[in-house]
Amino acid sequence: MKILVINVSLRPQSREKLFPIGLGYITTAMKNAGFVFDVLDIDAYRHSDQEVESFLRNNKYDIICIGCMVTGYKIVKTLSLLIKEFYPETIIIVGNSVATSIVNTLLTYTKVDIAVMGEGDETIVDLLETIHQGKPLDNVRGICFVKEGKMVSTAARPLIRDISKLPCIDFSIFDVDLYIQNSKISVSDPLPIPRDEVRALPVNTARGCVANCDFCYHVFKGVPYRYRTPGSIVGEIKSLIGKYSLNYINFWDELTLFSKKQNLELVQKILDDDLRFYWTGNCRANLFNSEDDIPIIEK
């Protein structure tokens, strides 16, 4: 099978080029399962609409996978129309929140064939293997598709409980040097080092959030908060620093720091392994509510 993975650009006018960490996990799972695929990284290279159209017209694929937030619905719709105009038989698979949150709209008003619901690491591999073997989709957990004019939702796929066992992202699937060079733009002020010296990549420490805020939606909303072990997190950081000479780590999670106990364990593991790096991460404002908590962060 000839497979293409597309990373869309939600903010083409922005100087920031943020590594697609969700798509990074998906493509890593695909690669580890033995699938060979191309990547069209529209966001990294800021390909124009004309360039994207030309690429899709001149390159035929059996399957095209698109990962996108719900705010990119219009982009996904446009891409699906283009793909089907050129190659009607190409199977279009879409994941992330644009699939999970508005699946009825997605499958009704676009040319998308299959929506991956929720966590996609295992689903995408199962789905691709099923398509490759010519088997019916009904037994693939965690997807929605249209069959004989009716929408079919398969059984939900169980959550990956121990996310520490997930393989770390293979950043080499994408243009990692481009993302590292651009990382200096996305790191927030105030900076502890000159901006031009920043070399950063993201690390995912958790999936989900302990809160259930009305204004927020993400793929892991409504499911248990899962946090990687300190050893797993630090092991990935150590590997990335050694491989890419990083001095900054972006903890890109819905919620990175959720308890003082967790924070102390992670800090201690970093100190035990003698790692030194700068970092950014997300936490609830009420987590650190006294001056006694500041030393945890300073460490």
What are these language model-derived features?
Residues 4, 9-11, 140, 146-202:
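N-terminal [4Fe-4S]-dependent radical SAM core
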Residues 5, 66, 94, 117, ...:
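Conserved beta-strand positions
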Residues 9-11, 70, 255, 285:
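Residue-level signal for short, function-critical loop segments
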Residues 12-23:
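Glycine- and acidic-residue-enriched helix-capping/strand-helix junction motifs
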Residues 26, 52-55, 75, 79-83, ...:
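A general structural detector for well-ordered alpha-helical segments in enzyme core domains, enriched
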Residues 29-162:
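Glycine-rich beta-alpha loop elements in corrinoid/cobalamin-binding modules
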Residues 171-299:
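Radical SAM [4Fe-4S] cluster-binding motif and immediate context
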